[in-house]
Amino acid sequence: MAKIDVHHHFYPQAMREALERAGGDPSGWYIPPWTLDLDKEISRVLKVQTTILSVTAPGPGIETDPGKAAALARLCNEEAAAIRDAHPLQYGFFASVPSLFDTAAVLAEIEHAFTNLHADGVTLYTRYGAGHSYLGDERFRPIWAELSKRRAVVFIHPTHAVDTQLINSWMPQPMFDYPHETGRTAMDLLTRGVIRDYPGCKIILSHAGGTLPYLIHRAATMLPFMPRNLGMSREEIVEAARTFYFDTAISANPVTLKALLEFAKPGHVLFGSDFPNAPRGAITHFTSFLEGYDNMSEETRRLVEREAALELFPRLRGQSTRACL
């Protein structure tokens, strides 16, 4: 089946140059090679028909000057739109935005990206600023309100933790720490009421939701008994967590995939590769495991590989139908 890949990065030249000026990715990850030819080649190998491009962390915020960060987001979005326009059956994109603390600049870029460039959604990172300002932060509510009004698809990608020290020199943060950051921001969104208050957003969590599916029952069972509680039962908290969408990037293994499929709502699990940031051997390994996984129905497989994404990105439905004829 021709897949739709919702977790797939690209490196505009301006982004690569900004990372090099900053001394590299603060997470400790290397900057991988990327070209459109390499991108198309991996899509053929993975049997991907349509890729939704995104700029991975740290994104435009690598520029600490607000004006430069906004300009970098604009350059990334213009380049992504040009790729999509040249190959509309093969590509879409999630728009980049500057730091969420720059509310006016973020709202301006959302307006440009959705109205003028027809972005398929927007990328947000798990936290912003020098502290633990996860995505439920009250200061980010005007942005959530705008995205909910637009019924936007929001792709949440982890970024480095406040503490950038590595476990050891073999373990850059994306390898082990990133899923914790995804779980933390998901719980922040749940406990601060963002999920409840802005239901128009369709939120994709990277890497099978990080630690959320594994730990949600632990937190949801304790929260109702805490002095400061949410006024929600355990069941209501768990059900709120199930409103997220989840991608399979670097996560299709016997333990994680089984747990994710049991936890997520039908149609809320989407294929993702994490190209080019994950090593190619890891990408093909996890994809092969997903393709050979026999503990899911054919209906579920169709949803994961393609059909669930078509519900989120309806513009692809007519195009993909014609392309498959």
UniProtKB/Swiss-Prot annotation:
One of its GO terms (biological process) is patulin biosynthetic process. It is an enzyme of class 4 (lyase). Induction: Strongly expressed during patulin production whereas it was very weakly expressed in non-patulin permissive conditions. GO terms for cellular component: cytosol. GO terms for molecular function: 6-methylsalicylate decarboxylase activity; hydrolase activity; metal ion binding. It is found in: Cytoplasm, Cytosol. Keywords: Cytoplasm, Decarboxylase, Hydrolase, Lyase, Metal-binding, Zinc. Patulin was originally used as an antibiotic and specifically trialed to be used against the common cold, but it is no longer used for that purpose since it has been shown to induce immunological, neurological and gastrointestinal effects. Genotoxic effects of patulin with dose-dependent increase in DNA strand breaks in brain, liver and kidneys have been detected in mice. However, more recently, it has been proposed that patulin might also have anti-tumor properties. Pathway: Mycotoxin biosynthesis; patulin biosynthesis. It catalyses: 6-methylsalicylate + H(+) = 3-methylphenol + CO2. Monomer. 6-methylsalicylic acid decarboxylase; part of the gene cluster that mediates the biosynthesis of patulin, an acetate-derived tetraketide mycotoxin produced by several fungal species that shows antimicrobial properties against several bacteria. PatG catalyzes the decarboxylation of 6-methylsalicylic acid to yield m-cresol. The pathway begins with the synthesis of 6-methylsalicylic acid by the polyketide synthase (PKS) patK via condensation of acetate and malonate units. This is 6-methylsalicylic acid decarboxylase. The gene is patG.
